[in-house]
Amino acid sequence: MSKIHVRKKDTVVVISGKDKSKIGEVLSVLPKKGKVIVKDVNVVTKHQKPNRENMQGGIIHKEAPIFSSKVMLYCDKCKSATRISNKILEDGTKVRVCKKCGETF
């Protein structure tokens, strides 16, 4: 239950596991579990039984959560995975900054 370093709609790159080097958008963050769900990463096959909402049933594909330690923020300017630092601007707002190039997120 550590603090998650990425937020919803951030672009991230997977740094380990079967989907290593895939780039995707964070769909949701699960802070109590320390996991994130990334678009088109860790896609699992689920056999859905027919029920009232889904009368057809069948096989569906959906993204499963992965640990947040396996993803890094992706900087569009650097075109690579990067660490971030927090910076306070003159007007008092706190922004996230790329450690490599200084670009704000």
Swiss-Prot record:
It comes from the Bacteria. GO terms for molecular function: rRNA binding; structural constituent of ribosome. Pfam families: KOW, ribosomal_L24. Keywords: Ribonucleoprotein, Ribosomal protein, RNA-binding, rRNA-binding. Signal peptide: none annotated. GO terms for biological process: translation. One of two assembly initiator proteins, it binds directly to the 5'-end of the 23S rRNA, where it nucleates assembly of the 50S subunit. This is Large ribosomal subunit protein uL24. It comes from Clostridium botulinum (strain ATCC 19397 / Type A).
